[in-house]
Amino acid sequence: DQVEIGLLEVNETGGDALARLSPLLDAMRPFEIESYEHLDRLLERTDFLAEVNAELADDDLVLLDFAYTGEMVGLLTRGKPVHRIGDLRSLRLRIISAGDLSLLAAWKVRGVRVAWEEVAQALQTGMVDAYLNPPIVAVMFGHGNVLDYFTDLRMGPSARLIVTSRRWYERLPPQFRAVFDAGVLEARAAN
């Protein structure tokens, strides 16, 4: 929101925020992208970014890149290991979007909407038993003491989306835009 209204020129965000604005980005479903190399090929060898950006034009956003954040997405659980889909049926998973609900409905698993700031407490109180994320997230947010297991589902790459204000970007003088674009490419190579 801050990028859209011009308070920030560049920001990182989760995929859910942009998926609501771009049907193509929303169509990236779990298990479609099998590795980081696969996502690299999609971003570097296709018009995927250009097509997503065409869908974001009315929202004054440009999707610059995906910043990879760790291992592939899996399932973090409290109290119960998960070895098969049937093991999930007794659990309540933390969700954030309608897409999450659709996935859990297909698995016949219950979901509970919980704000990220409340996940640790929701795990401690039994409001939720699990969430989907890469394993590093439990460490980054101090959930290690309330989670017991990680199941490597390899649902897809874990990434934050790097966006910029379209107005700001298009107003950059050509020499500054060239430097900015080179920085984005350099960041992609380093990531």
Residue ranges and their predicted role:
Residues 1-38, 54-191:
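N-terminal secretory/targeting leader peptides
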Residues 45:
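Acidic, metal/ion-coordinating pockets
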